């Protein structure tokens, strides 16, 4: 079996990067703030990456299953992930994404997602998430409701860490929340950006 454990799909780009809104235009282009950049190949006419396109690429490459991995860079697409997983249940699984900066409201959204039983876990992109809240750290007490929810439901946490202090915080979280499996994606990526 070949499984892609890090696939992205989105109906449109509606996220945030560099502290600015990012949105789809056409021919693979997106706007970031007031400037337009080529984000995808021009063949991506609507500047989106659909579940159907992913399934076609998977078939072409001989990939049996894929794990849909969200990112605030593209926007919050839990609904699209859920619909795609329901449409292709033998091919796709999906990880949830919530705005953890909302604290208790984010935890309530996660609990609802977990109760539905379609998506699992949670993804956090530290750099994108905290750009809008400088000085916030993974172990910040205002984020505790989110970690408490993941702990209660025994859900894994997929983390893209970009900052050295995230390692210290992750160690503290792992000791505090023993029922959360922390999956580190792209360890050491901050070196590329400094």
Which residues make up each language-model segment?
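Mid-domain alpha/beta scaffold segments of enzyme catalytic cores
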Residues: 1-137, 141
